[in-house]
């Protein structure tokens, strides 16, 4: 339960930041809401003893891993008896690696010589605000015309439009994008911050073309020009 509350807190922090940009109708930078990494200890772990010593949570009838809050950060860790660990909830790569180091300190209390190996970032989840509300129907129609077949939009089932960044530009990372009509955008699947930033730098320009306010203004200008031509003014 505490891990869920923590993740909700991280998401809440990002949502409040996006809400501030949305109120000003101002495009935001990209904010990280969750980083996930896996790693291995170089020995099997007595997770029952670890939970007893370090005040973790373990219920083997429902889940095979012990759960720990790591240090003072918002990160959480799962420790399996095989030695595998999963860290989640960090809001930066630096915090993620710090969480793994802090977890090793806990494990060293019962396994003094254990070392953490093969730390690998598996997923970075981030969000941003494009600067206005998005016409998802127009965006979806445009993606279909461009032959982007992996785009998915079924508003009766889910309010977001999904597509892969790589389908827009082959040079982009293999990450997934989720756009909502209020203007919020979620980028997931990145392994580095440069992948996230590269994706946002590209797609924000594409999505900006479908901001409702911009399209209304554009249509108004075209209508005015047409009227001027017809009246000869």
What are these regions (language model features)?
Residues 1-184, 190-233:
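Intrinsically disordered, low-complexity polar/charged tails and linkers
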């Amino acid at each position: 339960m505490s891990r869920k509350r923590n993740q909700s807190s991280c998401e809440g922090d990002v949502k409040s930041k996006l809400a501030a940009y949305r109120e000003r109708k101002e495009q935001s930078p990209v904010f990280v809401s969750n980083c996930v990494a896996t790693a291995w200890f170089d020995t099997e772990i007595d997770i029952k003893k670890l939970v007893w010593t370090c005040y973790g949570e373990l219920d083997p009838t429902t889940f095979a891993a012990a759960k720990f809050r790591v240090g003072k950060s918002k990160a959480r860790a799962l420790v399996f008896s095989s030695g595998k660990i999963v860290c989640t909830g960090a809001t930066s790569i630096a915090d993620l690696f710090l969480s793994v180091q802090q977890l090793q300190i806990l494990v060293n209390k019962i396994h003094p010589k254990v070392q953490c190996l093969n730390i690998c970032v598996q997923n970075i989840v981030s969000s941003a605000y494009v600067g206005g509300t998005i016409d998802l129907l127009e965006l979806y129609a445009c993606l279909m015309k461009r032959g982007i077949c992996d785009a998915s939009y079924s508003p009766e089932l889910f309010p977001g439009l999904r597509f892969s960044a790589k389908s827009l530009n082959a040079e982009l990372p293999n990450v997934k994008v989720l756009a909502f009509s209020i203007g919020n955008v979620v980028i997931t699947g990145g392994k580095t911050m440069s992948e996230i930033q590269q994706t946002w730098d590209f797609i924000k320009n594409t999505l900006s073309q479908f901001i409702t306010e911009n399209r209304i203004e554009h249509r108004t200008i075209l209508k005015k020009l047409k009227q001027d031509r017809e009246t000869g003014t």
